[in-house]
Every structure is written in C-alpha cells, then in structure tokens.
Amino acid sequence: ARDVDVLPFPDGLDARLVDVLRGQGYEGLYGHQARAIAAALDGQDVLITTPTASGKTLAYTLPVMQKLLETKGRARSLWLFPTKALSQDQSKVFNTRIEELGEDWHSYTYDGDTPPSVRRTLRERGQVILTNPWMLHQGILPNHSKWADLFANLSHVVIDEVHTLSGVFGSNVAGVLRRLRRIANHYGADPKFLMSSATLRNAQEHGALLAGREVTLIDQDQSPSGERIFGVYNPPMVNPVAGLRKNALEEARRIALTLVGPSHQSIFFCNRRTSVEVLTRYLKECAGRMGIKPEEVRGYRGGYLPGLRREIETDLKEGRVKVVVTTNALELGIDIGSLDVAVLVGYPGSQASFWQRVGRVGRRGSSSLAVMISRSDPVDQYLCAHPEYLFDAPRERLGVDPDNPVILSEQIKCAAFELPFRSEIDAATGDEVVRDFGPSPHVVDILDYFTEESGFLLKSKDTWYFTQDAYPAGDVSLAGNEPDNVVIFDAESGDAIGEIDREGSITAVHEGAIYQVEGETWKIERFDYENRRAYGRKVASDYFTDAHTEVEVRVLRLEERHRRGLTDDPAEDFSIWRGEVHVTTLATLYKKIRFYTRENVGAEDIHLPPEELDTDAFVLTVSNESLARLLEGEDLIADRGSTWHALGALLKRVAPLFLRCKSADLGVSAQLASGNFKRPALFLFDRHHGGIGLVKLFFDAWDEVFSAALEVLRHCECSHGCPACVGPPEEAGPEGKRAVGLLLEHLIAGGRPAATSDLEPEPAGEAAGTEEEALRG
C-alpha cells in the first residue's frame, strides 16, 4: 500500500478548470500530476511514467484544455494511441470534460473506421483529433494540405503508452514524429509533446528520441495504492522424472472456484490465444459453482471483431462481466473499471508486461490480489524458486533508433513526398547539411542517393523535389512486416467471426483446426491461403487443436567474414559471418487435445505452403573439436547442445541494447550440425523481410556485444542461470551459466586474429577450408 501525496493546483491553471475539478471533489492533484501539469504549462515537453491507474490522463488533458481556453478554442491537438479502443475510450472521457466545462469544443477519433462524411468535419472542426501512428503515417501527413488548419494551430501532441513504441516499430514512429514536426514548422507551429508511459528503465532517453529534444521526466508515483497481495502458485508434480506438473489451465479453473464470485471482478491473463479460449470455456461451464452466470464470463483477445470487443469492454466497465479471460490485449490502459483479482497463467515474458497485468487490479486505492500460476516451463519454475526476481529485477530498456540507415531512408522518402528538403552550408565545417530531420549526418547522402541512383528526387540548387506520382507512405510499414490478416467466416451464414495475422493462421485456421470464440467452436473446412480467407462450420467439439511448426535456416550468400584463432591449429578457428539466409516456417501437423483431460485423441498432417523469409543473418561457427575442448576442460562437464542454445538466448537478450531494437525483432537458431557448415552454427537473423540493417550493426560490433553478454553473466547474482542471463538451469543445463561464460571468454579474449582474418567475400570455387567447401556443396 502507498499513501497519497496531494499538492495544490498549479499556479497558472485556469480558474474555470479548477472550479470544475473542485466540483468533482478534487481538493488538489497527486504530486506527479501537479508537477507534470506545471511543467507543461511552462512550455516544456513532458514524459510521465507512473503505473496504471495513477491519473496520467488528467496530467495531459488539463494542459490541452488550458490552451483551448487561452486561445478561445483555436488551438488544436493531436493525440496518438496504440489501439483504436484506447482512442475511442479517451474521446469519451475528453468529451465528458468538455461538457462539464460548458465549452463548444469537439474531439473526434480518426481511424480506418471513420466514415468519409465525418473526416471532413473533424479536419475542419476537431479541436482534438485522437488517432494512431498508422493513420498519422499514411493518412494525415501525406495529405497535410487538407489538414492545414490543424497543423497551423497545433499546440500539443499527446502520445499515450509510449512503452509500446520500441524496436523497429518505435524507430519508425520516431521518424513519423520527425515528419510531423517538420510539417507543423512549415505551417508556423511548434507543438509541445505530452507523453505517458508505464515505468521504464531508460525513460528520459526514450522520450527524447521520440520528441527529438530533451523532455522533462516525471516518474515518482504519488497516487494512493491499496494493499496488494501477491502469490506465486506452483501446480503439483504429476511426473517427477519428466518434471511435468498439473496443467496450468486446469489449475486456473480450480483456483477460480475459490477466487471468483458475484461481488467482485476478476481478470485471467493467458499467453496464447488458444489458452484464452480453452479457459473461457472451462469457466463458463463452471460458472454456477462460482455463483455467477455463464454470460458473465467473457473472453477477449486480438482477432475478435471490433463490435464484440467494444461490447465486452463496456460490460466490463459497467460491472456486467464478472470474469474476463484475455491475452495481452487488455494490458494497455483502456478503462475497464476497477478489477479486484488478477490471475496470470504463466509468466508473460517481461517485467514490463508482468507489471502491466498486475496493475489491472487494485485501482483507486482498493485492496487486490494477484496470483501467477506457473507452468512446467523452465522460466516459470525459476520464478517459483526465486519470486524475488519479479520485484527486484530492473525493468527492461527500450531501444529506438530513428537513424537506422534503412528506417531513416524510408522515412526521408515519405518526408520528401510531403515537403521539399532544403539544405544549407554549415558555417563551422563548410558541409552541406539538412537541419529539419534529426541529427543524422547522412540525410544529405540519402537525398543525393535518391536523386542520382533512384531518380525519384530532383535537386535544384539547395532543394530536393519529389518527382513521381508514387505514394511512398503506402509502401512503408511501421512494424517492418505489415500484418496481412486472414478473415474467418461462418460457412453457413457467411458472417465474419474473427481474424488472425497471416503468420499465426498456419497454426490456427488450417483445414481441420478448431477455431474458438468465447467457448464456441468452429471446425475449419477450407482455408483459402492465397486470398486470406478461412471457412468454418459451427460444431460442438469436445477437443481443441494444437499445431506444430518446424523452422529451417539456409544460407543463400555470405558477404563478410571475420576469422579468429582459438589455438595455433587452424582447424580450431572460429568464424563470424554476415550474409543472406532463407528462413522457412512450416506447419507440419496438428494434434487433437481433449478438453479437461488433455488426452491426445489423434493427429493429422497440415498441407500448407511454408511461411518464407529472405533476410540477413549473423552467423557464428565453431569447430566441434573447439567446442568440446572448451566445455570439457577445467573440471567442467557441460552439454554442448544446451550451452550452444543458451549462448544464443543470451545474445538475443543483449543484442537489442546495441541495435536499438526489440528482442522480437531478432530470431535465433542454434544448430550443432549445420547443413551449411558441417559444424556448430549459431544464427541470429533479422525477422523483417529483406532485413533493416540490424545484422550489419551486430556484425560490426560483435566483440562489444559478446563483451556485454559476458558482463551480464558476471554481474547476474544467480548461481547457475536465470531468465535474465542464459535461462534457468533446467533449460541451459546445471553448468550452463559457467559454460557460456567460459565460451565467451575464449571467443573474446582467447581468440586472436588468424592469418585469414577480415577476409573479403571469396568467389565460389576459390575458398579454402572446411566451411567454404561445405558452402559450395
């Protein structure tokens, strides 16, 4: 529990706003609200990072309303949210405050569902436009002349949930915000940024990269917090030899019989969509035993149709739903009311996500309970043995790099379509520079490349003009790989019942799959893979399906290489490569799993083409002899396979700190017997089609990344491995931490440049050595 710290309303806050707040029962503001509002009224860019339900919305709403009062409604603001639901939720909140103030102002949501008739109205009359980064990128900025009044009077840009802006997506959004500032400046405005976020490890840096300038950080939560009881529950063992425990979903159902009731609301978080549907079915079927009705149990996840999601959100907020089972779809700050119990079925994979889920309960000072049910997964089991990790481990850092060469080039292309670029001569250096698109020294080089090589820019004196009819923003994906959704239809009625991203479709809506929505089941009869449509017939199924995939990495071309010597024997050299690879993900078969008993009642093959990805990869190869010698000496007996996989897991965790991306932007494949190299090979590949330059950055700084990984091991307080380093001992092996440390030491310090170090790419047929021969084959 935490006591509240209330401060007086900031000096300068309009008396009309103060009167409205006092009429609502406010005697002042929480300390963090008051400081954030005071900084905003002083003209500063502000980032407030406090937990869910700490009143962040008021901290950015009041400065916007103050500016509207000062300008008699002429000021305009743009609010960015990561989801449509959040935009619509906040629009309702803001319109309520407008009514309380008695002003004739208007706020509108602008997204893909906004009718054309409304779009013209909101462009002309909307003091507040609530939208998302995708609509800003493809809808507003390229058509800025239609939004001239908005940009000319733009006083504030509000960005909510900025912790969701990381990796490739966050880097692209930072580029979009550069374009926004550039256009606003063109119309004579210089908007201030008001941002909110969950707690971050590098909040100040993250906010500055998004805003393009320093921000004032408000990070001390001074809102009230009721008592919150935490529990970590480890299901009983059913097979000690195999380390298997009772199924977490079954245990969640059993725990619900005790925790769920008609007098309070509960939320259950699952990490997979299938788990959401299975648990929703279980809880609906035992609703009577919990004192509630089946219709008071709802599922909620991505893929539900928008109307269904809005219905569930409203029923949650108004108390008609007693239990909701969800994925991370309800982690974000949409207002669903004050919940009392949170049950996490498994660790969600990050501290940020864990605390977002736990933060859904205990709002507004009430007492609450949060329980995590562990699975047999090694990470979950580690957290059962070391629950202090959940509270003591530092939050993850967020990586954003708007100057990544590929991302910067794409955003410059979009910006050139919107407005010409102009350069000037730097008085100190004599260099030609462009000053309105961030600090990168490569902006002029990129513009010249687009002029001389690509031909879609024309340079006249100091100005670059876009010369083609192309619409570049339409071809630039903010997420790197734009989702290509599959729509699922009821085969009898023809109605759409859901949607799913293409990557997930091969395991969820293949022919024979059981597709579930809130406990109801459809058997997929036909999957039109090319046209992205699946058709299912409603059935009363007593089983669900679980599909398996295989991932294969094949080398296409190697471009750069470093060779290092571990000993005087060239056979024990190790090599680091950068090249192009082909990654295939193939759905191979699916199992039919009986509800409740989890009995496997059959398996069938899946007949779908593989998902294919041509991308860049960083490759580490070591001879079998070297790996065996390193791991079997110094009184160390370590499993080579576990150690090799643990090294890959550690590098995947550490690399984003150098590449300014998310861990999810990288894929890893650890092979003890690579078909390309005939020796152990570790692949770290860019998960975006064609690659976006992450691998080149990794290759150029591999020794720094390896050294940082070794430092992580040395400073980690665990004894034999944990989720923060190489993974739990059950996953990395009992000697995994020590083995990976020794391997890194030899790779960094023990390795020395071999005679063939820093080789240029060799033509096929002229290479020497086992690795090159294998590649030729």
Roles of regions detected by a PLM:
Residues L747-G777:
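Acidic, low-complexity intrinsically disordered tails
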Residues S367-A370, S376-P394, D401, V406-R422, ...:
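Extended Lys/Arg-rich polyanion-binding regions
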Residues P51, P235, G303, S623-E625, ...:
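Short strand-loop junctions, especially beta-strand C-caps/beta-turns
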Residues A40, L283, V726-P729, L744:
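A general structural motif at alpha-helix termini
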Residues C716, G721-C725:
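Short cysteine clusters
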